[in-house]
Regions:
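Conserved AMP-binding/adenylation subdomain of ANL enzymes
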Residues: 49-68, 75-182, 192
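Adenylate-forming
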Residues: 272, 306-333, 365-417, 437-439, ...
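Conserved ATP-binding/catalytic segment of the ANL
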Residues: 253, 259-319
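Active-site loops of AMP-binding adenylate-forming
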Residues: 45, 212-216, 224-242, 279-282, ...
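Conserved pre-ATP/AMP-binding loop-to-beta segment of ANL
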Residues: 5-30, 37, 62-68
């Protein structure tokens, strides 16, 4: 392939450029449609180019030389277009296109082949990478684990000792620690990765700290298809609870904030969509007369200008008592207290109190993406701490092993009582961090298998499909709300 234009090709390019106006539609993006039919977002040439340039300018302090990235997200996802196609064009990156089943269990295999220097991922992707790193550590020798523990402490301290929260000073201890953890990073294909982005949902502070301790800084961001992609990016790794500051060229405001300063996040700038294709009514609902795009996300701005995401308006749980509760905060706290839990889904709309559906971490079939009955190493280790030596979910829950034709409704889930007590203790700890009494979880249920794309609980970008999950497990939810069901989490905490 020629690396330079000959006169004829250049003339052809000029001719095509003259046929295109900056305000014409360049890209159609389908929204995820987790609560209904997807809408089609129209993005103009100007919106796309502006967003790429704003992103590029904002990440200036970080490495911007040509590198390697890997495309594995569905290309109808705006983040995939931005970080796996368009940004690489601007930076001159080499792009590896992953196996079509990368998100069904083959992600690590593809990362090992591509060896990217930068990567974009949704939180669940980083959770899976973290799990693989923990497995690699656990399977290493005692000396390696000892050195790794020291190295992670040094690396985390190196990042947090740096006042601006950017790249740490390259002291001798930092360099030695970095070399120690490089072995584990290489095992998951991130041996060369210098910069990672996280979007789609907030990445937990716990996960961010773990990746910093492995010398893998992850920059959180906030954006939307309707906003042309990214709108905020973390420029300081020390801001673990935020999604960063607003990018250059973007305006943000919090609409109708409550007493805590939380309200709907609204955005304005050149990146905003033209509208929804053939849906003028929804367009006017999204973009007001002053040009503000209403994101549907709830959050607040801290005094240092960082944006903090609380959750989605459509996911807000409104209890029978009229309390508006963002479930994401509660779910993240629960997962932080219970390392054996892969998914936590809070339920309580129009109910007197909150309950939570939990799944224990199990292995996933790389070929089909379906959950195995075998428990993940994190779960096995957690069970051993309870003096339980079972290695299968069916044994822990006393149900038949999962198969593609599995129907849990014919089974009664009776978890091991030691497990019930330990989960209750974890939820009690999480409840101590509740922002109000109404935000305390009072009952829980362990579900018969992990959430996956093939079983329907996760969408194509690995987001939980709340409405689908609540419908699928409606009988379990109703059982939790029966008065005869024991209150596992007491009101008097």
């Amino acid at each position: 392939m020629s690396l330079s234009f000959d006169p004829q090709l250049r003339q052809e390019l000029f001719f095509k450029e003259k046929q295109i106006a900056a305000n014409q539609c360049a890209l159609l993006i389908f929204t995820s449609g987790t609560t209904g039919l997807p809408k089609v977002v129209m993005l103009s040439h100007d919106a796309i180019v502006s967003n790429i340039k704003f992103c590029y300018a904002t990440v200036g302090p970080f490495r911007r030389e040509p590198g390697v990235t890997m495309s594995y997200l569905p290309l109808n996802h705006v983040a995939a277009q931005l970080f796996e196609v368009l940004m690489p064009l601007l930076c001159g990156d080499c792009v590896y296109f992953a196996d079509r089943d990368a998100l069904k269990g083959k992600l690590i295999k593809n990362l090992r082949i591509a060896q990217p220097t930068r990567l974009f991922g949704v939180p669940r992707v980083y959770e899976k990478i973290q799990e693989e790193l923990l497995v690699a550590e656990a399977n290493s020798s005692y000396l390696c684990r000892l050195l790794s523990s020291w190295a992670k402490r040094v690396l985390l301290k190196s990042y947090f000792c740096n006042a601006d929260g950017l790249e740490p000073k390259r002291t001798l201890s930092y360099i030695c620690a970095s070399l120690i953890v490089r072995k584990f990073k290489a095992q998951v294909g991130l041996g060369r990765c210098a910069y990672l982005w996280a979007g789609g949902a907030p990445l937990s502070a716990q996960a961010k700290k773990y990746f910093l301790s492995m010398d893998i800084p992850v920059a959180d961001m906030f954006g939307a298809s309707e906003a042309g992609g990214a709108m905020t990016i973390t420029r300081s790794y020390c801001h673990l609870e935020s999604s960063g500051r607003v990018m250059l060229g973007i305006e943000v405001k919090i609409d109708k904030p409550n007493e805590q300063g939380q309200g709907e996040i609204c955005l304005r700038g050149r990146c905003i969509m033209m509208g929804y294709l053939n849906n003028e009514e929804k367009t006017h609902e999204c973009i007001d007369s002053d040009g503000w795009m209403h994101s549907g996300d709830v959050g607040h701005l801290s005094t240092d200008g960082c944006l903090h995401i609380t959750g989605r308006i459509k996911d807000i749980v409104i209890t029978a008592g009229g309390e508006n509760i963002p479930p994401l905060y509660i779910e993240n706290r629960i997962k932080a207290e219970l390392p054996c839990v892969s998914n936590a889904l809070v339920v309580g709309d129009k109910r007197k109190f909150l309950v939570v559906l939990l799944t224990l971490k199990t292995d996933i079939d790389n070929a089909t993406g379906l959950p195995f009955d075998t428990l993940h190493l994190d779960t096995v280790s957690w069970l051993k701490s309870l003096d339980i030596h079972q290695t299968r979910l069916s044994e822990v829950l006393n149900i038949p092993a999962f198969t593609p034709s599995f129907d849990y409704k014919g089974s009664v889930i009776k978890p091991n009582q030691k497990v019930v007590a330990a989960v209750e203790a974890g939820l009690t700890r999480a409840n101590k961090n509740a922002l109000s009494r109404a935000q305390r979880v009072q009952k829980f249920a362990l579900l018969p298998h992990d959430f996956t794309v093939p079983t329907g609980e996760l969408g194509p970008t690995l987001k939980s499909r709340r409405a689908f999950i609540c419908e699928k497990y409606a009988d379990i939810i109703e059982e939790l709300y029966k008065e005869s069901s024991r209150l596992l989490i007491k009101n008097d905490l």
